[in-house]
Amino acid sequence: MASLDNLVARYQRCFNDQSLKNSTIELEIRFQQINFLLFKTVYEALVAQEIPSTISHSIRCIKKVHHENHCREKILPSENLYFKKQPLMFFKFSEPASLGCKVSLAIEQPIRKFILDSSVLVRLKNRTTFRVSELWKIELTIVKQLMGSEVSAKLAAFKTLLFDTPEQQTTKNMMTLINPDDEYLYEIEIEYTGKPESLTAADVIKIKNTVLTLISPNHLMLTAYHQAIEFIASHILSSEILLARIKSGKWGLKRLLPQVKSMTKADYMKFYPPVGYYVTDKADGIRGIAVIQDTQIYVVADQLYSLGTTGIEPLKPTILDGEFMPEKKEFYGFDVIMYEGNLLTQQGFETRIESLSKGIKVLQAFNIKAEMKPFISLTSADPNVLLKNFESIFKKKTRPYSIDGIILVEPGNSYLNTNTFKWKPTWDNTLDFLVRKCPESLNVPEYAPKKGFSLHLLFVGISGELFKKLALNWCPGYTKLFPVTQRNQNYFPVQFQPSDFPLAFLYYHPDTSSFSNIDGKVLEMRCLKREINYVRWEIVKIREDRQQDLKTGGYFGNDFKTAELTWLNYMDPFSFEELAKGPSGMYFAGAKTGIYRAQTALISFIKQEIIQKISHQSWVIDLGIGKGQDLGRYLDAGVRHLVGIDKDQTALAELVYRKFSHATTRQHKHATNIYVLHQDLAEPAKEISEKVHQIYGFPKEGASSIVSNLFIHYLMKNTQQVENLAVLCHKLLQPGGMVWFTTMLGEQVLELLHENRIELNEVWEARENEVVKFAIKRLFKEDILQETGQEIGVLLPFSNGDFYNEYLVNTAFLIKIFKHHGFSLVQKQSFKDWIPEFQNFSKSLYKILTEADKTWTSLFGFICLRKN
C-alpha cells in the first residue's frame, strides 16, 4: 500500500505519461463501510446545503477478462460505453472513524464492443452527484447487483424500482420515491476534478474529513480519540496482530485494558485468605487512562478529555490507569503503565504501586485534580483483622466519590496478567446490555406481549469460539437485528442466556418509563425479580460512556462470561461478612489427598464408562449434579443439552464457573449446552417437572436419559421420597428413555458391618499407613436392611475428616418402586466388576490400588432402568 503523498505524486505523473493520453485518469476517495443510515445522513446533509446536483441512471455490466474488469456502461436512456478499468495504486486510512476510507488511483481505457454472457455482474446505479466545488464532486449511489439467473429474472423489476418512478426524480424526492432498504448497496465516492498539479495530500484529507463530519460532527475528535488509544496500546501490547486490531478499530479501549472480574464465592475460595492482596474501594466512576504526552495532558475514557498542557517543554510520557469523574474532571489512579518514560507493565503490582503515587504527583503539579486510590496491603489471615481492613475501605465516609464495592488486586503479575476482582453488594451487582427492540410478527410463544410494556431483547458480546463451545444458538429474531457481516465476525452479540435462566434476555420495558428510545443503546441494569418466564429488570442508567465502544463494532455490553459470572451473585449472594470469614456453604470444600489417587481414578473410570453409554444424546438430566464433577465426562460424550439439578446454589455457581473453564482450557470434539436448575429434589415431582419443562427448548416428550451419580441416598429417607423420585423420572423421560444411577449399595454396606460386628454408633475403618482412609459409622439399630430410613455416617475423601450422613439405598426396594411406576430393570452391576477393565485402562494406577480401595469400591454399584 502506497503512502498518500506517493499516490498524489503518481497521479500527477500520469498526465505526463504519453502511453496514457487516451485514458481517463481518476483519483477517487471511497468509503467502504456505508450502510443505509450513513448514506441517508450524508445525502440529507448535502441536500440541506442546496449544493448544485444532478441525478443519473446507468446499468454497468462487468466481465472479468484476464484479471481485468471489462465494462459496458449503459448511460440511460441510450448511450453505451465500452472500457476497461485498471487500478494503479491505493491508500487506505487506518483510523476506524474513517469508515474504511480508501483513496484509489485508476485508469479507464476505451475498448471494442464485446459480447455479454451469463458470467457478467450487472450493477444498476441511481447516482446523485453534488458539485461541492470546482475541485471536487461527491457522488452518492444506490446500487443493485445481479448475477447469473437473477439478471433475467429481476432486471426489469429493479430497473422500474430504481429508475422508472411514478414522479420525476429530484434530489429532494429521490429517497422517498425509491424507498431504499437492505436490498441495495450504498456507495459514497469523492472524485477530484481540479488541475492535477494543484492537488496535495492535505487536500485529500480535508475533503475526506468534510464528508465524515457530515456523518459525525465530532469526526476530528473521534480521530484524535482513536490516536490516543493507539498511543496507549503501543505501550501495552507487543503483538502486531493485537495492535492491528486497535488500529483497525476492531478493538476499543475496553478490549485493550485488563478487565476487573466480578468475584463469585468460587473465585474467592481459590485464594482465601487473601494475604498479600491489595484492597481498595470501587468508585462509581468510569474507567479512564490519564496520559501526559509531550506537552498535552488528557484522559481517554468514553471520549477524549483534555486536561491542559505542561507548557512549552515536552515531558517524557506518563500513563496512569484509574477511574474518572467527567463532571468534575477528577482522576483517581489505581495502576500505572508508564512513569516518565519508564515502562512498568512487566512489574508486579506491589512494585508498580510505588510509581503510581509519583505519577499522581506529576498530574497534581499541573493543577490536575488527581488522587491515588487508598490501598491496604492485606498481611493477616485473621478474620477479625480482615474485617477491619475491609470496613476501613468500604465504609469510609470521607471519600470524595460514592463507593459501590471493593476491589482486590493480586500481586506478582504483569499489568495485563494481574487478576483484579470486584465485590459488590447484591443490590449493586449490575450488568451492561446492548438492548434491541424485539422485531414484530415473530410468532414465538416465549415472546408473548404484555399490555403496557414493549418487549426488548438483551445482548452481550461473545467470541465465535466460545459461542461454539457452549453450543449456543441465536435467539428468534436475531437475524432481523444484526447484519450478516456482524454475525460473521470473531466477536459478536449474543442474547444473554445464563445456564440457570435461559430466558433472562427478555426485558419488558414499561411504556411509562422515563428512559425512552432505548433500542440500540447500552444499558446498565439490575435484576429485581425472576418471574416464571422472564426477569424483571430495572434500568440503572444508560451507559453513554460506552457509546463510542459500541461504534467500534467490537463491543456489545458485558462479555458473555463476565455477564454470567456477575449473574451468579444473584443466584448465590456473596455477603460482606464472607469477605472476612470466607465463603459459607462451599460444597465439599476440602481437597482429596494423594492416598485416594488410585481409588478416585477407578471411580472416575467407571463413571466415564457409564456416561459414554449415553454419548451424543440430545437431552440429558443430571439429578444432584453438585458442582459439576462429571461435566467433563458429559462434554467428552458429546451430550448436546445437559440439565443439572441441585439444591445447593453455591455448587451450581461452581458448575457454571467450570462450564467456562472447560470451554477455555479443554478441547472437546462436541459442544454441550448447559442448563442448571436450583431445586430441592425432595419437593413434589409435579412441581419439579413443570420447572424443567419450562426450560427454553426442552422437548415436550422429555429427555433421552436421566443420570444420578452418588446422590440418590439423600432421597431414601422414606417411601414417599422414593415414590416421588420414580414419578419425577417418569415425567421427565421420553418413552424408552433410560435412568442411570450409581450409588452405595445398602445390602453390601450392611454385609460389611455384619462381617466386622459393627454395632450402633460404632465405626468401621479402613486404614493405610496408620491413616484412616475410609470409614462408616452405623447410626441404625436394625439387623436387616429396611426399605428406607436407615442412616449411616460416611467419611469422604473430600470431607476433611468429618462424617457426612446419608441413607442406605435398598436397591431391591428402589427397583420395585420404579417398576410400579412404569420402568423395567435393564442392568444392575457392582463396581467391583469394573476392576479388571480398569487394569487394562491403566496398569500403573491399578498397581497402586490397595485392598482397602477394592473393598470400598465393592460397596458401590450401578442400576439402569428403562421407561416402558
Curated annotation (Swiss-Prot):
Keywords: Early protein, GTP-binding, Hydrolase, Methyltransferase, mRNA capping, mRNA processing, Nucleotide-binding, Nucleotidyltransferase, RNA-binding, S-adenosyl-L-methionine, Transferase, Virion
E.C. no: 3.6.1.74, 2.7.7.50, 2.1.1.56
The keyword Transferase is assigned to this record: yes
Annotated site location: mRNA cap binding: K627, R658, H713, E806
Subunit description: Part of the viral DNA-directed RNA polymerase that consists of 8 polII-like subunits (RPB1, RPB2, RPB3, RPB5, RPB6, RPB7, RPB9, RPB10), a capping enzyme and a termination factor.
Listed name of the protein: mRNA-capping enzyme
Domain notes per entry: The N-terminus contains the mRNA 5'-triphosphatase domain, the central part contains the mRNA guanylyltransferase, and C-terminus contains the methyltransferase domain.
Pathway participation: mRNA processing; mRNA capping
